[in-house]
């Protein structure tokens, strides 16, 4: 699933080299943490969250087949925020 999320997100963004997916496995649930470049955050989320919802729907469908639950968490990169804040001063 990690590779699926990476492939889909890399095709959506302007900075595919900054797409990082971390997989955290639990007993029945797997959390996929997605990090993208700050400027690509809107592309991954989409208007009214439609793109993110579509990715989560694909994960849910694939998870049914594997009898696992997959949660996608889109993480804002802290280092991008810090560099942006330091540039504003």
Can you annotate each of these PLM segments?
Residues 1-41, 53-89:
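RNA-contacting regions in translation and RNA-metabolism proteins
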């Amino acid at each position: 699933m990690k590779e699926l999320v990476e492939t889909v997100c890399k095709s959506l963004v302007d900075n595919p080299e900054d797409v990082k997916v971390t997989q955290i496995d639990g007993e029945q649930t797997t959390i996929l943490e997605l990090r993208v470049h700050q400027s690509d955050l809107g592309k991954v989320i989409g208007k009214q969250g439609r793109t993110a919802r579509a990715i989560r729907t694909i994960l849910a469908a694939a998870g049914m087949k594997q009898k696992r639950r997959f949660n996608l968490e889109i993480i804002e990169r802290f280092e991008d925020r810090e560099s942006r804040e330091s540039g504003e001063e």
